[in-house]
Amino acid sequence: MAENIGTVIQVSGPAVDVQFPEATMPGIYQALRVVSDGFDVPTPINVILEVQQHLGEGRVRCVAMEATDGMVRGMKAIDLGGPISVPVGRETLGRVLNVIGEPVDNMGPVQAKVHMPIHRQAPAFDEQATGEEMFETGVKVIDLIQPFLKGGKIGLFGGAGVGKTVVIQELINNVASKHGGFSVFAGVGERTREGNDLWLEFQEAGVIDIHDFSKSKAALIYGQMTEPPGARLRVALTGLTVAEYFRDQEGADTLLFIDNIFRFTQAGSEVSTLLGRMPSAVGYQPNLATEMGELQERITSTKKGSVTSVQAVYVPADDMTDPAPATTFAHLDATTVLSRPLSELGIYPAVDPLASTSRILTPAVVGQEHYDVAQGVKRILQRYKDLQDIIAILGIDELSEEDRLTVSRARKVQKFLSQPFHVAEQFTGIPGRYCKIADTVRSFKEVIEGKHDSVPEQAFYMKGTIEEVLEEAEKMQAAK
């Protein structure tokens, strides 16, 4: 079949208009390649575009997946005959790829046997799996208060600088290194430095082996802050396509980490404006819910294999009612909300146990004891929150004996919900802790039952199990 070739007629930043013969206009989401053959340019142009709009009379408006520096009118645009296709399969493990599936790790080409388009249908309703099984993360506050669902979708919500990426990196460290299946990390519009750190940490942890990729268990797909909006909008789909292949063809339990889903929405807003759409609430794109739904509906577990996804969600100006985080909420099985007031108290991870939720925190899934302890912890923390105004105005001495005891236990619980992380060890100097769920439930049960009312609250800070707390209390006693 003869090549379908068009001509670039307008370049305005990442938006490019291309003229084709009307009979051979490429379809929406088709990929085009612009080349600088015959043009005298300092660096050769070889840029992938994605068709977004048909303007009529053979003209299509496209969004570039790479910078359009040096592109001029008159350049050739070759229709690639289908959507952007990326390499998938075991050959992607250990590699760092960009939105169009090209390696960016200077380790040579990806020798993949299979390529798949990034635009695909979500699995049919009757193919989806509906099991309910808890997924242990080793992070106390998560396992106790908002347990993660195996094969579910989890959101980490937080404003700027409260620790979303650190929590995601700890989950990767705890889960990817102990987990038997494959992991895919999609870096969507986040810092390049964090992407580099993660790649190096994966090598140290043995999750990636750059000397023998066949021993690696993770693939990294990056579209960082420096990329044009087209790349940031589509890189989540590229990562998801790699994860879908492991789920459907390998039947593997796959982990998909996305940092940050808000940048996906932000890039969509930029693209929407470039395409001339009328903005909707707070300046977001009018198709925000549709775009989010198309991505989220594909992140699911089927009868062949599971995809458990953990998504960081930036909350602009700490406003949970902002359309971007509010639209994401609807798709999740568990939400972990990171709180600025807690991070200011030095409690890390700064998870707000009262604002975080999980669909599987029920006796039927986690067991009666776990459920009762989690509700007991929430009850004590809620009562403490209710009493804070009285304490601020009148002082703690004006409380009843019972309320003073509740406040004392709540402060211990709050401190005990902190935990040293492996990935933060180099900053804190405290070795990381992985806490088994049985130890976590037992430890908190003892605290809320009042077995450790005599232990000073400072002993509970940054500890793993109750045994470590008692050991610290003995040291404090001996030092007096």
UniProtKB/Swiss-Prot annotation:
Keywords: ATP synthesis, ATP-binding, Cell inner membrane, Cell membrane, CF(1), Hydrogen ion transport, Ion transport, Membrane, Nucleotide-binding, Translocase, Transport. PROSITE patterns: ATPASE_ALPHA_BETA. SMART domains: AAA. It is a peripheral membrane protein. It is found in: Cell inner membrane. Gene3D superfamilies: 2.40.10.170, Bovine Mitochondrial F1-atpase, Atp Synthase Beta Chain, Chain D, domain 3 (1.10.1140.10), P-loop containing nucleotide triphosphate hydrolases (3.40.50.300). It is an enzyme of class 7 (translocase). It catalyses: ATP + H2O + 4 H(+)(in) = ADP + phosphate + 5 H(+)(out). One of its GO terms (cellular component) is proton-transporting ATP synthase complex. Its main location: membrane. InterPro entries: AAA+_ATPase, ATP-synt_VA_C, ATP_synth_F1_bsu, ATPase_a/bsu_AS, ATPase_alpha/beta_chains, ATPase_F1/V1/A1_a/bsu_N, ATPase_F1/V1/A1_a/bsu_N_sf, ATPase_F1/V1/A1_a/bsu_nucl-bd. The keyword Ribosomal protein does not apply. GO terms for molecular function: ATP binding; ATP hydrolysis activity; proton-transporting ATP synthase activity, rotational mechanism. Pfam families: ATP-synt_ab, ATP-synt_ab_N, ATP-synt_VA_C. ATP binds at residues 158-165. Transmembrane segments: none annotated. Its EC number is 7.1.2.2. Belongs to the ATPase alpha/beta chains family. Produces ATP from ADP in the presence of a proton gradient across the membrane. The catalytic sites are hosted primarily by the beta subunits. NCBIfam families: atpD (TIGR01039). F-type ATPases have 2 components, CF(1) - the catalytic core - and CF(0) - the membrane proton channel. CF(1) has five subunits: alpha(3), beta(3), gamma(1), delta(1), epsilon(1). CF(0) has three main subunits: a(1), b(2) and c(9-12). The alpha and beta chains form an alternating ring which encloses part of the gamma chain. CF(1) is attached to CF(0) by a central stalk formed by the gamma and epsilon chains, while a peripheral stalk is formed by the delta and b chains. HAMAP family: ATP_synth_beta_bact (MF_01347). This is ATP synthase subunit beta.
